[in-house]
From Swiss-Prot:
It comes from the Eukaryota. Residues 63-160 form the PH domain. The keyword Manganese does not apply. One of its GO terms (molecular function) is lipid binding. InterPro entries: OSBP_sf, Oxysterol-bd, Oxysterol-bd_CS, PH-like_dom_sf, PH_domain. Plays a role in regulating ADIPOQ and FABP4 levels in differentiating adipocytes and is also involved in regulation of adipocyte triglyceride storage. Weakly binds 25-hydroxycholesterol. Interacts with OSBPL9 to function as lipid transfer proteins. This is Oxysterol-binding protein-related protein 11. The modification Phosphothreonine is found at residue 27. Gene3D superfamilies: 1.10.287.2720, 2.40.160.120, 3.30.70.3490, Pleckstrin-homology domain (PH domain)/Phosphotyrosine-binding domain (PTB) (2.30.29.30). One of its GO terms (biological process) is lipid transport.
Length: 751
């Protein structure tokens, strides 16, 4: 251990690192160099003084100097050593010293961040590497996941800033003097496509020739370039549509290797052109004479698709060559428009949504005698502990909903969700959150039905909302009240009188499948009227356990109560499918935690799995503690799909009967208004086939979607084209909604 480094550095536990490290990891450095040691980060920006309010999910994009202790891997002999690191944003350098006292001396090592790559490790939540353009590499380890996330975020912002400066400060090379209108002697001119192909992929040559005549780039020409980019991108979208709408088999099919390569190459070309256009803008801005007037803002002229090229509400429109083709025909279900469409977020108004009338009631599997041969064939290919992420499971075990919609169903009690922020004290708010958390699983898991939802396709999204009458949301009365307000709940929404929009709170929900391998989903919900939102990302890891299958929900969520300046970090339990050869059933298991670093309250929740002999099914216990005094303020016991008993520190008890708890129906857009990649429209053919008990037909539709996803993933890998998400942005190890409520509404702690 180096001098000047307090011993407390080595005492950070795993749980504290994950849940509590954030509040103390970042401190303002307004006065002097009083930096925290032992992995604590000192920041020169006053904005970081918010502490733990949103650091796990929000980072400002301004330049911020950071310094603090990190462990650096030296070599096999020496191993890991503590070193004091300084991020010099102005110079674009990452420097390190033996300890903080020697920071006034020459640094022991320096890395240029321009062109560098910052890579968090997949093996653990503490390690990351900084790979400089020169080939030099620093392998570093933070005290905990939150500290690593902060360092990675600051380094990435600094790297991006100085990398973009390269394009601005170094003008592009002079263009070569050759003419596109050459004689017919070049190899390209000799490879003329057939007339039929030209009519299929029509290109506006007259406009392209007009661009070739412009020898000099004047300021006004940036607008013209943008217009041409818009035109080219519109043609590329049309190309993708035409390829995807070809029949799946025949002389020219949508899965033809040459056409798939053409689609991927055109996508990569447009991405490259967008980057070049951005460099032109930077170059033009650097040549502007004189300083800009104060208050002037610069808006980049991003290429935009003309309105005529947009398809309203994402609905498919027939081509001019096929005017009588019905929208619902399988050939016209152009599902894989993912390349361009998935990159453009869409603001969906809750006014476009209607109360859900879809009845996807699930029947339990019961005995699986008829499917035993299918299951035995599958089991013969599996090994104990094998990862099932890439294993295709039989269709008959599927629910009629996507995993993304399952996450939405966890929000089916919006009155309890909104009521959290009504808690009068931090203790009351924590208890209300635990109550909401425990009551969410019975609807999210549809009781304990032994079926699994669809695995979402990458780029798949799901949108919905709930309207909750303000009169039905619990007031600020303490949750420890013995009045059975929840067991004698208000009537179900369909029985309640019609409420105007102004008399209701609106809870909006959006989910997106942001990664395929590993399968990661991001979801976000907010109630803007009450200034509260929840952001979460979940990686589902499934393993074969012999006669059962276990699914681990890796990831975490954060509930932000902006009215109180509080954040509640939580995790999710594991799920197990038992007795898969006889009568399958599902249970939840494992320990999860809820923590609020600001108030010092935490909750430990245990989902008990059934022992081999005796014991109850679906049992859950929980304790809510005040960490500063280690006092238990509430205990919970019961079954997560039946009855829960809350016992408070004053001796009072409350029972929550989940069978009597009202479920608010979600509001969704009609199917014809949904985008091609929204869950219900994407899986429509599979769902319809399952409703009709056409298992073979459902399997074929499901296989078609999965094969298309694999093909596109392979082509993206071959062409080096990264996947771009639509609504969520990767920050450190997590995924954050692109327009979270906390970015628009400042956190204002209550007096």
């Amino acid at each position: 251990m180096q001098g000047g480094e307090p011993a407390s550095v080595m005492k950070v536990s795993e749980s504290e690192g994950k849940l509590e490290g954030l509040a103390t990891a970042v401190t303002p450095n307004k006065n002097s160099g009083n930096s925290s040691c032992g992995g604590a980060i000192s920041s020169s920006s006053s904005n970081s003084s918010r502490g733990g309010s949103a650091k796990g999910w929000q980072y400002s994009d301004h330049m911020e100097s950071v310094n603090g202790y990190l462990m650096k891997y030296t070599n096999l002999v020496t191993g890991w050593q503590y070193r004091f690191f300084v991020l010099n944003n102005e110079a674009g350098l990452l420097e390190y010293f033996v300890n903080e006292q020697s920071r006034n001396q020459k640094p022991r090592g320096t890395l240029q961040l321009a062109g560098a790559v910052i890579s968090p490790s997949d093996e653990d939540s503490h390690t990351f590497t900084v790979n400089a353009a020169s080939g030099e590499q620093y392998k570093l380890r933070a005290t905990d996941a939150k500290e690593r996330q902060h360092w990675v975020s600051r380094l990435q912002i600094c790297t991006q800033h100085h990398t973009e400066a390269i394009g601005k400060n170094n003008p592009p090379l002079k263009s070569r003097s050759f003419s596109l209108a050459s004689s017919g002697n070049s190899p390209i001119s000799q490879r003329r496509p057939s007339q039929n192909a030209m009519s299929f992929f029509n290109v506006g040559h007259s406009k392209l020739q007009s661009v070739n005549k412009r020898a000099h780039l004047h300021p006004d020409h940036l607008v013209e370039v943008r217009e041409m980019m818009s035109h080219a991108e519109g043609q590329q979208r049309d190309l993708i549509r035409r390829i995807e709408c070809l029949p799946a088999s025949g002389l020219l099919s949508s899965l033809d290797q040459d056409l798939l390569m053409l689609k991927a190459t055109s996508m990569a070309t447009m991405n490259c052109l967008n980057d070049c256009f951005h460099i032109l803008q930077l170059q033009h801005a650097s040549h502007q004479k004189g300083a800009l007037p104060s208050g002037t803002t610069i808006e980049w002229l991003e290429p935009k698709i003309p309105l005529s090229n947009h398809y309203k509400n994402g609905a498919e429109q027939p081509f001019a060559t096929e005017p009588n083709k019905p929208m619902g025909a399988p050939e016209a279900q152009c599902v894989a428009e993912s390349g361009v469409l998935a990159r453009e977020p869409e603001d969906i108004s809750a006014d476009d949504e209607v109360e859900d009338t879809c009845d996807n009631k699930e029947d339990d599997l019961g005995a699986v005698e008829e499917q035993r041969s299918v299951i035995l064939h599958l089991l013969s290919q599996l090994k104990l502990g094998m990862d099932l992420t890439r294993v295709v499971l039989p269709t008959f075990i599927l629910e009629k909903r996507s995993l993304l919609e399952m996450y939405a169903d966890f929000m089916s009690h919006p009155d309890l969700f909104i009521g959290i922020t009504n808690g009068a004290t931090p203790e009351d708010r924590m208890i209300r959150f635990v109550e909401y958390y425990l009551t969410s699983f019975h609807e999210g898991r549809k009781g304990a039905i032994a079926k699994k939802p669809y695995n979402p396709i990458i780029g798949e999204t799901f949108h919905c909302s709930w309207r909750m009458p303000k009169s039905e949301v619990a007031s600020g009365v303490s949750s420890s009240s013995s009045t059975p307000a929840i067991t004698d709940h208000a009537p179900l929404p369909e029985e309640a009188p019609t409420q105007s929009v102004s008399d209701c709170y609106t809870v909006r929900f959006v989910a997106e499948q942001v990664s395929h391998h590993p399968p990661v989903s991001g979801f976000y919900a907010e109630c803007a009227e009450r200034k509260m939102c929840v952001n979460a990302h979940v990686w589902t890891k499934s393993k074969f356990l012999g006669m059962s299958i276990g699914v681990t929900m890796v990831g975490e969520g954060v509930l932000c109560l902006l009215e109180h300046g509080e954040e509640y970090t939580f995790s999710l339990p594991c799920a197990y499918a038992r007795s898969i050869l006889t009568v399958p059933w599902v249970e939840l298991g494992g320990k999860v935690s809820v923590n609020c670093a600001k108030t010092g309250y935490s909750a430990s929740i245990t989902f008990h799995t059934k022992p081999f002999y005796g014991g109850k099914l679906h049992r859950v216990t929980a304790e809510v503690k005040y960490n500063l005094t280690n006092t238990v303020v509430c205990r919970v016991q019961g079954e997560w799909n039946s009855v829960l008993e809350f016992t408070y520190s004053n001796g009072e008890t409350k029972f929550v009967d989940l069978a009597k708890l009202a479920v608010t129906k979600k509001r969704v857009r009609p199917l014809e208004k949904q985008d091609p990649f929204e869950s219900r429209r994407l899986w429509k053919n599979v769902t319809d086939s399952l409703r009709e008990s056409e298992i073979d037909k459902a399997t074929e539709h499901k296989r078609s979607l999965e094969e298309r996803q694999r093909t596109e993933e392979r082509l993206r890998t071959e062409t080096g084209t990264p996947w771009k998400t639509k609504y969520f942005i990767k920050e450190g190890d997590g995924w954050v909604y692109h327009k979270p409520l906390w970015k628009g509404i400042p956190s204002q702690p209550a007096e």
